[in-house]
UniProtKB/Swiss-Prot annotation:
Gene3D superfamilies: 3.30.420.40
High-level lineage: Bacteria, Pseudomonadati, Pseudomonadota, Gammaproteobacteria, Chromatiales
PANTHER family cross-referenced by the UniProt entry: GLYCEROL KINASE, SUGAR KINASE
Family classification: Belongs to the FGGY kinase family.
Swiss-Prot/TrEMBL catalytic activity: glycerol + ATP = sn-glycerol 3-phosphate + ADP + H(+)
Full protein name: Glycerol kinase
Residue numbers binding ATP: 11-13, 264, 307, 311, 408
A molecular function GO annotation: ATP binding
GO CC, alphabetical: cytosol
Length: 495
């Protein structure tokens, strides 16, 4: 027997899944780990906790699969993107907690870069916006605020990486400092047209090139394992950012196919072929993957808060005891009773890109009860996704005829039905909603010749067809957009 081990390092948990040569699941493991919030708008991880949680589930998944390590033909890796780490090349010790993609501490730096006339440079070469979401300004903050970091970086003593780089470093015993093209494209430092680190971008952010990892293909053996507890020599054969991995895992291998992953945030990608499409609607142009030196591109819209709004109802408000309860609670009412929740807890992502927006709950009366708020929270995910898809359709010049979905919240039938209603198009949910891990496994399987483990565009789906009239949808969207306008700019210091 031959198998693929997929590592899926996310924002709130690490997981590992072992797939057989036909794509069937043999064993899984998952472990949560904490986020830290040292100041309002700041979000951090402990790099050691990232690695230790990923290491533990890797071991557990293989044990639960009931196969020897010698059966693992390759390892695929996918990860939360943009989260930024800085560590000592000699010791492997981090210099600071990882700054998470949700973190907004560099909003003013982004303002300064725009004011200095750099926005066009970054937009044209990276396909991204000058926003705190991306890695480049986070790395600049670390260099400016960690004592001695800039001097040591210029001396070549430090390594920068996104989470894929950190895990590859750990898996190879510090022998390899790499990142794949999809992760590199999320840093504000990579020219997506040439596929290389861009000297002008580095200069604009004052970042030494000595910090940077080598950029590699998303599918291909880049090294082998060399860490305690894991046999040496297992090929590391696939690496991609989580949303690009999900696009691949959903079988969206042709231009015009789109998917939405509902995780902590919601992430929508549309494959656009082998040429990047510049967005006129504040979407991101990004690398989908690079295989055999050929780059596929995508349009992307990122919603910062999706499933995290359910966590907030559970942990912040105590409205539910577990996330699984929300659908049953929301079904107790036929609608939200006019309540709208805009979960701009960390600003708004695409297509608004407003770091100063903040969450609001509007439309409440004395008749508003827990189920109305629960339903408004679920509907907020669908409203945000619909805004992004509308912008994609304009940029790409075509209509999304169906949306493929995955991620934890895609198991919620109420949410998926409302998403189909708003889109006016079918929503297709695969039997296996772990498309992120499946994509990483498929990229690795491709590299080691296990083609049976690769995803099919014709996989079995559960379909949700639209039911609401277009008039009702237009009314609901208009009210949602009015609520969004009220949330906009709330934290801005207008004085």
């Amino acid at each position: 027997m031959q198998a693929i081990l997929a590592l899926d390092q996310g924002t709130t948990s690490s997981r590992a899944i072992v797939y057989d040569a036909h794509g069937g699941v043999l064993g899984t493991a998952q472990q949560d780990f904490p986020q830290y919030f040292p100041q309002p708008g700041w979000v951090e991880h402990d790099p050691g906790e990232i690695w230790q949680s990923q290491y533990r589930v890797m071991i557990q998944a293989v044990e639960r699969a009931g196969i020897p390590w010698s059966a693992i033909a390759g390892l695929g890796l996918t990860n939360q993107r943009e989260t930024t780490l800085l560590w000592d090349r000699a010791t492997g010790e981090p210099l600071h907690r990882a700054i998470v993609w949700q973190d907004r501490r560099t909003a003013r730096l982004c303002d300064d870069l725009r004011r200095d006339g750099h926005e066009r440079l970054f937009r044209e070469r990276t396909g991204l916006l000058l926003d705190p979401y991306f890695s480049g300004t986070k790395l600049r903050w670390l260099l400016d605020h960690v004592p001695g970091a800039r001097r040591r970086a210029e001396a070549g003593e430090l390594a920068f990486g996104t989470v894929d780089s950190w895990l590859i470093w750990q898996l190879t015993g510090g022998r390899l400092h790499l990142t794949d093209a999809s992760n590199a494209s999320r840093t504000l430092l990579c020219n997506i047209h040439s596929g290389d680190w861009d000297p002008d971008l580095l200069a604009a952010l004052d970042i030494p090139a000595a910090l940077l990892p080598e950029i590699i293909d998303s599918s291909g053996v880049c090294g082998t394992t060399c860490c305690a507890g894991v046999p040496e020599g297992i090929p590391i054969a696939g690496v991609a950012g989580d949303q690009q991995a999900a696009l691949y895992g959903q079988g969206c291998h042709e231009a015009g196919l789109a998917k939405c992953t509902y995780g902590t945030g919601a992430f929508l990608l549309m494959h656009t072929g082998e040429r990047p499409i510049a967005s006129a609607n504040r979407l991101l142009t990004t690398v989908a993957w690079r295989i055999g030196g050929r780059t596929a591109y995508a349009l992307e819209g990122s919603v910062f808060i999706a499933g995290a709004v359910v966590q907030w109802l559970r942990d912040g408000l105590g409205l539910i005891r577990s996330s699984d309860e929300i659908e049953a609670l929301a079904r107790q009412v036929p609608d939200t009773g006019g309540v709208y929740l805009v979960p701009a807890f960390a600003g708004l992502g695409a297509p608004h890109w407003d770091p100063d927006a903040r969450g609001i709950l509007v439309g409440m009366t004395r008749g508003t009860e827990r189920p109305h708020i629960a339903r408004a929270a679920l509907e907020s995910m669908a409203f945000q996704a619909t805004e992004v898809i509308g912008a994609m359709e304009v940029d790409a010049g075509l209509a999304v005829k169906e949306l493929r979905v995955d991620g934890g919240a895609s198991a919620n039938d109420l949410l998926m039905q409302f998403q189909a209603d708003l889109l006016g198009a079918p929503v297709l949910r695969p039997a296996d909603t772990e498309a992120t891990a499946a994509g990483a496994a498929a990229l690795a399987a491709r590299a080691v010749g296990l083609n049976g483990a690769r995803p099919s565009a014709e996989a079995a789906f559960t379909a949700f067809s639209p039911r609401l009239s277009r008039y009702e949808v237009e009314q609901r969207m208009a009210t949602w957009q009015r609520a969004v306008r009220r949330a906009g700019g709330w934290a801005r210091d207008d004085d």
